[in-house]
Amino acid sequence: MVKVGVNGFGRIGRLVTRAAVLSGKVQVVAINDPFIDLNYMVYMFKYDSTHGHFKGTVKAENGKLVINGHAITIFQERDPSNIKWADAGAEYVVESTGVFTTMEKAGAHLKGGAKRVIISAPSADAPMFVMGVNHEKYDKSLKIVSNASCTTNCLAPLAKVIHDNFGIVEGLMTTVHAITATQKTVDGPSGKLWRDGRGAAQNIIPASTGAAKAVGKVIPELNGKLTGMAFRVPTPNVSVVDLTCRLEKPAKYDDIKRVVKAAADGPLKGILGYTEDQVVSCDFNGDSHSSTFDAGAGIALNDHFVKLVSWYDNEFGYSNRVVDLMVHMASKE
């Protein structure tokens, strides 16, 4: 079983750790976070406002974080090149600070003895992999990879199924996206666009996202054919993608439902879901799929122009894919 280090014990760091423990597919052996001490880690891992109590045991013992009886080494280094991952037995490192997202910055982990680094965010220059879409293109010469974004993980499997069956001429994506940690609780200054700094609980905030363009990196045939934007809305978790696209081959909406369901039951099982129920966002809190197609929410204008809707738990679904990507990479060693 691959031994994993986690850098940054924020939303994704903690949920990747939960996903690792729950799945039993990888073993977390080390965590680095300079801003959270050991006892605080115990508390933050145990209690979660969005995903509830951790259903297991967690405690601090002999300077280590012990989850379900497994001791995890704790580091508190600000500089990733100083983290002694090898000493803790960590072979793969999940880079989940959101700060070290380039090849050069994430590469600092290799100095501490990590063999591979998985960036849990989009990267400007690291190769991006989306499970179920292009993970087969991974080869073991790559030391640093990106698991792309939660939104790309939702959109890409759906876009792949539609493109493989009907051909996407062009498309626009909108993600109606839950609040994330970078937003403000009340109006404040923003480092990027001014409106990004407006109160998250009070507003629907138009925002940029590279998620749709990134699909062109994981599905090269769609490069330049998709772009998109986001609305940040006052919900704590679970987001939804609206893909509006023009199809090359004519298709009835029932044809689209059929091929998506076939993919969800077959090659993309566990990654792409399918539902005909009258669901709302809360119904996907804690869902481990990358994307769940909402058959009842989509609409067709005609046989060539459709709006498709797919839900995702932007925290937990994504964290499960980080684990799956590491398992896949380990199978190629």
Curated annotation (Swiss-Prot):
Keywords: Apoptosis, Cytoplasm, Cytoskeleton, Glycolysis, NAD, Nucleus, Oxidoreductase, S-nitrosylation, Transferase. The keyword NAD applies. D-glyceraldehyde 3-phosphate binds at residues 149-151, 180, 209-210, 232. It is found in: Cytoplasm, Cytosol; Cytoplasm, Cytoskeleton; Nucleus. The modification S-nitrosocysteine is found at residue 150. S-nitrosylation of Cys-150 leads to translocation to the nucleus. The active site is at residue 150. It holds the Pfam family Gp_dh_N. The record marks 177 as: Activates thiol group during catalysis. Pathway: Carbohydrate degradation; glycolysis; pyruvate from D-glyceraldehyde 3-phosphate: step 1/5. The keyword NAD applies. Its EC number is 1.2.1.12, 2.6.99.-. It catalyses: D-glyceraldehyde 3-phosphate + phosphate + NAD(+) = (2R)-3-phospho-glyceroyl phosphate + NADH + H(+); S-nitroso-L-cysteinyl-[GAPDH] + L-cysteinyl-[protein] = L-cysteinyl-[GAPDH] + S-nitroso-L-cysteinyl-[protein]. NCBIfam families: GAPDH-I. Has both glyceraldehyde-3-phosphate dehydrogenase and nitrosylase activities, thereby playing a role in glycolysis and nuclear functions, respectively. Glyceraldehyde-3-phosphate dehydrogenase is a key enzyme in glycolysis that catalyzes the first step of the pathway by converting D-glyceraldehyde 3-phosphate (G3P) into 3-phospho-D-glyceroyl phosphate. Participates in nuclear events including transcription, RNA transport, DNA replication and apoptosis. Homotetramer. This is Glyceraldehyde-3-phosphate dehydrogenase. It comes from Gallus gallus.
